[in-house]
Amino acid sequence: MSRRHVCPVWVGYLLANPVRALFQDPKKILGPHIAPGMRVLDIGCAMGFFSLPLARLVGPGGRVICVDLQQTMLDSLARRARRAHLLDRIEIRRCDADSLCITEFHGQIHFALLFAVIHEVDIAARLFTEVRDALRPGGRVVFAEPKGPIPRHAFDESVSVAEHSGLRKIDGLRIPWSHAALLET
């Protein structure tokens, strides 16, 4: 997707640090929304802070499609997934500046995670539309942005863009240090 600012690789290492799970525990955040066997999208996956726990949650019959713009981040994710014996549950995809490159998943995805990614793209509507198109009817999205650099009004504007793209907000979520919402097709 077009980018305003892309997360530097060195920040990816900080974001993947296991200490982060003390404050933003992926199982607590995502567990209520994931069931074994699901097909899940992790958009802007970076080095896999959420991807690996998602792979555990979907189990051997599920699949996590991990999408990022930066090959270095994806290479790190692949190494981490291999070490965790989860690579068989993860599909790693590099998107480009104009597309998430996920059209073949049209109507097949149960759940998508958009965590700290919208502020990095120029055209949020395009990203939300591609995610909506990939989701099955009733598919859900956890959408979150960091509170520090992203003011509340900017997050609310992004939720409005998501709603204009065909998603609807069904709930607010409480995620430490984040503005967050649960969206649905």
Short names for language-model regions:
Residues R4-F23:
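Class I SAM-dependent methyltransferase Rossmann-like catalytic core
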Residues R20-M38:
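Conserved alpha-helix/loop element of class I SAM-dependent methyltransferases that forms part
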Residues M38, D98-A112:
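A short acidic, Gly/Pro-enriched loop at the edge of an enzyme's catalytic core
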Residues L41, M47, L52-S99:
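Class I SAM-dependent methyltransferase SAM/SAH-binding core
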Residues I109-D122:
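A short SAM/SAH-binding and catalytic strip from SAM-dependent methyltransferases
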Residues A125-P137:
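A short glycine-rich, Lys/Arg-flanked "PGG" loop and its adjoining helix->strand segment in the class I
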Residues R174-T185:
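Core SAM-dependent methyltransferase catalytic element
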